[in-house]
Amino acid sequence: MTARLQEFYKEKVVAELIKQFGYKSVMEVPRITKITLNMGLGEAVNDKKVIEHATGDLTKIAGQKPVVTKARKAIAGFKIRQGYPIGTMVTLRGQRMYEFLDRFITVSLPRVRDFRGVSGRAFDGRGNYNIGVKEQIIFPEIEYDKIDALRGLNISITTTAKSDEEAKALLAAFKFPFRN
């Protein structure tokens, strides 16, 4: 059984983008290749339990076990040594990616306090989109009573689009709530 957004992409989005940009082949149409969720945890230097809690939260959000990211080099100013765990990240592809994107757009984003849409300027120039989430409690999988601290995370959506304009059209076709 394919994800709802994946079918929506094949049936509606592809045709819409071919009409808008005049692609000659279906394979030229931009698509989302992966979504990366990253949680940077600077406070993990002092408390090892922080990594466990964050990993648990990210597992619930993504439905997949994240990897713990370690410091590449020592930085005395931040009191970290090489190999210290400083974050956690998970990469979603395929069906899980589309299911996460569906939940994110329809359920999680509307739960953000004072939500007026996401910025249309957070593209990196190569057709990828980044969005920062200030609190992990916007996700319905996270129970408010069971969290130890409010943590933010970065969501990076990687596409095959050649330009920001194409990537924005792709995400807008997925009903991404962009600010005007």
Swiss-Prot record:
Description of how the protein assembles with itself and partners: Part of the 50S ribosomal subunit; part of the 5S rRNA/L5/L18/L25 subcomplex. Contacts the 5S rRNA and the P site tRNA. Forms a bridge to the 30S subunit in the 70S ribosome.
Taxonomy, superkingdom: Bacteria
Signal peptide positions (record): none
The protein's name in its UniProt record: Large ribosomal subunit protein uL5
CC per GO annotation: ribonucleoprotein complex; ribosome
Keywords: Ribonucleoprotein, Ribosomal protein, RNA-binding, rRNA-binding, tRNA-binding
Family indicated by similarity: Belongs to the universal ribosomal protein uL5 family.
InterPro entries: Ribosomal_uL5, Ribosomal_uL5_bac-type, Ribosomal_uL5_C, Ribosomal_uL5_CS, Ribosomal_uL5_dom_sf, Ribosomal_uL5_N
Summary of the function given for this chain in its UniProt record: This is one of the proteins that bind and probably mediate the attachment of the 5S RNA into the large ribosomal subunit, where it forms part of the central protuberance. In the 70S ribosome it contacts protein S13 of the 30S subunit (bridge B1b), connecting the 2 subunits; this bridge is implicated in subunit movement. Contacts the P site tRNA; the 5S rRNA and some of its associated proteins might help stabilize positioning of ribosome-bound tRNAs.
PANTHER family: 60S RIBOSOMAL PROTEIN L11-RELATED
UniProt keyword RNA-binding present: yes
Pfam families per the UniProt record, alphabetical: Ribosomal_L5 (PF00281), Ribosomal_L5_C (PF00673)
PROSITE patterns found in the cross-reference section: RIBOSOMAL_L5 (PS00358)
Presence of keyword Ribonucleoprotein: yes
Gene Ontology biological-process entries: translation
Organism for this UniProt entry: Ralstonia nicotianae (strain ATCC BAA-1114 / GMI1000)
Recorded GO MF terms: rRNA binding; structural constituent of ribosome; tRNA binding
Organism taxonomic ancestry: Bacteria, Pseudomonadati, Pseudomonadota, Betaproteobacteria, Burkholderiales
HAMAP family membership: Ribosomal_uL5_B
